Swiss-Prot record:
Its main location: plastid. This is Small ribosomal subunit protein uS14c. Keywords: Chloroplast, Plastid, Ribonucleoprotein, Ribosomal protein, RNA-binding, rRNA-binding. Belongs to the universal ribosomal protein uS14 family. Coiled coil: none annotated.
Length: 100
């Protein structure tokens, strides 16, 4: 189980990313269409003034049940070992376990 503080930090990052999403996209479009280098630097400075945690690359997917940050399956939003346990317990419809 992940620490509660780490999970709350991820939620805070998600909120910041949603809040600044349009601002970041519009400034990136302005950078690509700016004719001179000095204008690009001004727009880039505006982009840099936004919080670091508003960048989408700072987000990290976590397991829905345990909060584990690694080995997550996007379709189920679960980590690998929790997914395996749920499949073996027949809690996920449509998922089949492999047997050799």
């Amino acid at each position: 189980m992940a620490r509660k503080g780490l999970i709350q930090r991820e939620k805070k990052r998600e909120k910041l990313e949603q809040k600044y999403r349009l601002i970041r996209r519009s400034s990136k479009k302005e950078i690509s269409t700016a004719p001179s280098l000095s204008e690009k630097w001004k727009i880039h400075g505006k982009l840099q003034s936004s919080p670091r945690n508003s960048a989408p690359t700072r987000l990290h997917r976590r397991c829905f049940s345990t909060g584990r940050p690694r080995a997550n399956y996007r379709d189920f939003r679960l980590s690998g070992h929790i997914l395996r346990e749920m499949v073996h317990a027949c809690l996920l419809p449509g998922a089949t376990r492999s047997s050799w």
